[in-house]
Amino acid sequence: MNHLLQRFSQSLCRLGINKPRERIVIALSGGADSVCLLLLFKKVSPQFGIELAAAHYNHGMRGKESDEDAAFVAELTNRLQVPLFLETAPLKWWQQEPGTKMEAARRLRYDFLSRSAEQAGARWIALAHHADDMAETVLFHMLRGSGIKGLSGIPAKRGPFVRPLLPFRRKELEEFLKAEGQHWRHDSSNDSDVYTRNRIRHQIMPALLSFNPKLVETLCRNADLLRADAEFLDRECELVYGQVQQEEGLKVQALVDLPLALRRRVLRRFLEPENPGSEKTDAILEQLQKNFGRSKIVDQVGGKYLINEGGILRSYEELPWLENQDFFYPIAIPKEKNHSVRLEVPEAEGSLEVTLSTKKPVSLMHDEGPPSKPMKTALQLKAEVLQRGPLSIRNRRPGDWLSLAGRAGRKKLKEFFIDKKIPRQLRDRIPLLTSGEEVLWVIGCWTGCHDTIDQPGQDVITFQWYGKTI
């Protein structure tokens, strides 16, 4: 038994639970594992200066048996002089909780443990999972087709939750309790093979142990190796994420150039808190690789639309442009100079401010290359543009065209959108500054107007866009 206590002390040190006056709450169900955890902590607490408390949540799922568990825990902690936090779930609590009954029970239990630790001023919450639990968990995830994280099993430490018994087998914990003359409660639900975990414990594990008597140790060791790999890849993912990210999206070319392991992690990181699963993740990546230079809706994840917008992957909760809402607003030019009027354009989620002045502006570039930053949200034109006809802000119409600055001819707006790889789904939503069928400014993208301002003192009209751009 001294050897077991020594190993337990070493486990606490590895977890960093070795500071004087450390406060710990022990999750105490009354089963052999948690009772053993409590007794081990009680024995080493003088050595470490640990202050203990226990917490028991009575779900009432097994009726009288659950109440007897709570009574047993209360008697045990009273005898050991360990403070106890005890809470009983309301009747038929599972009817108000989302998810399966088992998921809801786990959620309520962990919430109670967190509240108990806060009330006790405890830094740590100790759980009684051991090596056999680890092996069964790895097999469970393997049967479900989980990836590297699932096959990493149960972490020894996650947030405030610690598991000091992971290096120990179930059998040696029970032998310790017998040597101490300490009884424990038996959970009858563990006898039923209705639950997958119980079938793994009762049927699959014994069969596999006949092939490899050291199977539990093997699975635990493999889980440790995989967890180290997963942690390394997660760190690498965080390092490259900033390189792949652009504004609120991901650069598709940079994403598909990553090694597959990082590609998957970066995409899942982008989709958080949604968890699309490995098959969905790979399907999205396959679509991006096939069409990384094209604009299209890639997929839908958790109610969100993934769209490749000309090489940038973005996520949208809704696609209002699919409703194809036409809009048209005549633009009123201020009658007095240095005054502004503002026009709201709700369909494009923005507004246009129009100012008449004689101030000499900074020259603007007019080419078909990437626009300079000011041209995305601001434009200045000679007031002579009004001679062409009334100005308006609207979305696209059949027959729209724009002038090719610096060269003869025109270009259809449709061809411009194709050349700029602007997604078809977005084109009806983009606001345009127009004069008849001529597009003077594709707001957020480009201007096709020849009216550069080259003389001081000219009357000019300044257009400033406030709101979303593509």
From Swiss-Prot:
ATP binds at S29, G30, G31, A32, D33, S34. It is found in: Cytoplasm. GO terms for cellular component: cytoplasm. Keywords: ATP-binding, Cytoplasm, Ligase, Nucleotide-binding, tRNA processing. The keyword Secreted does not apply. The keyword Electron transport does not apply. It catalyses: cytidine(34) in tRNA(Ile2) + L-lysine + ATP = lysidine(34) in tRNA(Ile2) + AMP + diphosphate + H(+). Belongs to the tRNA(Ile)-lysidine synthase family. This is tRNA(Ile)-lysidine synthase. The gene is tilS.
